Amino acid sequence: MSNRILLVEDDPINVKFIQTVLIKKGGFEVIVSEEVDEILRVAQGGDLAAIIMDVSLSRSSYEGKKVDGIFITQLLKKDPATRSIPVLLATAHAMFGDREKYLELTGAEGYLAKPIHDPALLIEAVKAVVKS
């Protein structure tokens, strides 16, 4: 099984924290991108254990339109080549009912509220979707 994680995140502080935890505590290899074409190319290339997807991306665009992590996850789940890759949504939008709404809307396998302060919780969430 692959140990590669695609991290789709636009906040440099979150990228550094998540990437460091995944590498040092989880033993994962981490690829970071917020460019939709690169995300799709990496995902279609296979060999990913999971994708961690920020829901609110500020700089991502697809076919000339600004898009968020919800849209990108929907693209991935519609594509037969990428639909089986587990997606863990990561979002600061952690209001009551958001988890269920986002999971249903995207078909993602997991949800993690940000900010993430507990490395063990992050590793546990990633391992849970990898096993799903």
Task: Give short role names for the model-derived ranges.
Residues 9:
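Conserved acidic carboxylate
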Residues 12-37:
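Two-component/phosphorelay signaling modules centered on CheY-like receiver
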Residues 32-50, 54-60:
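Acidic, metal-coordinating helix/loop segments flanking the phosphotransfer/catalytic sites
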Residues 47, 81-86:
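His-Asp phosphorelay/catalytic-motif detector in bacterial-type signaling
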Residues 60-83:
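Short amphipathic alpha-helix used as the core "switch/output" element in two-component signaling
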Residues 63-67, 71, 94-112, 120-124:
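Alpha4 helix (beta4-alpha4-beta5 surface) of REC/receiver domains from two-component response regulators
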